[in-house]
Swiss-Prot record:
Full protein name: Protein phosphatase CheZ
Organism placement in taxonomy: Bacteria, Pseudomonadati, Pseudomonadota, Gammaproteobacteria, Alteromonadales
Annotated InterPro entries: Chemotax_Pase_CheZ, CheZ_family_phosphatases
Site (Enhances dephosphorylation of CheY-P): 175
Gene3D superfamilies: Helix hairpin bin
Alphabetized Pfam families for the sequence: CheZ
Enzyme class: hydrolase
Family membership: Belongs to the CheZ family.
Protein EC: 3.1.3.-
Length: 245
């Protein structure tokens, strides 16, 4: 069983309209039609006024939103500078790290070769299978090895410390990247708000091609010399207020 719906006209009104038309009471029939349509017209008028007020308020808020101007004039250019700075800092850190590693590798290789050069004679010494002149030469080699190792190990320590210090850019650049992300989110939010105000309606809301279209008048010429048009947001606001919206 279908639920009853409230129609635009009831049976009694329809019969009354037919009776008036059959009796030739055209004016009374027209008056009855106007009475029937009056609530519908008022509801439509109220809805159009409400939507107009919402759109007007949104446009005014959009125009006076100083945050959008600030975003365009300062925040976005500043964000580009921040990202460029992050790129520069990352590149500098990468170069410092690679330079330190390139210098460290030969030092590590030299330590390995020095150990390999001394190890055979040292092994013979541990086996007590070494001549006196070989022992003297081993002592000189060990002395040179200790001196070179001390110098190379100190340099390796400096280079490793440089690599560690080169990574301190991450804290600063991380903060900058997070700030840029916040800015992008804020811009996205403003764009969504803008699309809400000025965006297109869904396709289902568009009028069908078969329906009668209203011809656009185009821009109003000499608007400041006419009394039947409004020329600014203040006048729009006054008009809506006078209509109760």
């Amino acid at each position: 069983m279908q639920a009853e719906t409230s129609g635009l006209i009831n049976l009694a009104q329809a019969k009354q309209l037919v009776d008036l038309l059959e009796a030739g009471q055209q004016e009374m029939a027209d008056e009855l039609i106007r009475d029937i349509a009056s609530p519908i017209q008022k509801e439509l008028f109220d809805e159009v006024g409400r939507l107009t007020r919402q759109l007007h308020s949104a446009i005014v808020d959009f125009q006076v939103d100083g945050r959008l101007v600030e975003l365009a004039n300062s925040e976005i250019p500043d964000a580009k500078e921040r990202l460029n700075y992050v790129i520069d800092m990352t590149e500098q850190a990468a170069n410092k790290t690679m330079d330190a590693v390139e210098e460290s590798l030969p030092l590590a290789d030299a330590l390995t070769m020095n150990v390999q050069a001394v190890k055979p004679s040292w092994d013979r010494l541990m086996r007590r299978d070494i001549q006196l002149h070989e022992f003297k030469a081993l002592c000189h080699d060990v002395q040179q090895f200790i001196e070179r190792s001390e110098s190379d190990s100190n340099r390796l320590k400096e280079l490793l410390n440089n690599i560690l210090l080169a990574q301190d850019f991450q804290d600063l650049t991380g903060q900058m990247i997070r700030r840029v992300i916040e800015l992008v989110r804020e811009v996205e939010s403003n764009l969504v708000s803008m699309l809400t105000v000025f965006g297109e309606q869904p396709a289902t809301d568009k009028p069908r091609a078969s329906e009668k279209c209203v011809e656009a008048e185009g821009p109003i010429m000499n608007a400041d010399q006419r009394d039947d048009v409004v020329t600014g947001q203040d006048e729009v606001d006054d008009l809506l207020s006078s209509l109760g919206f």
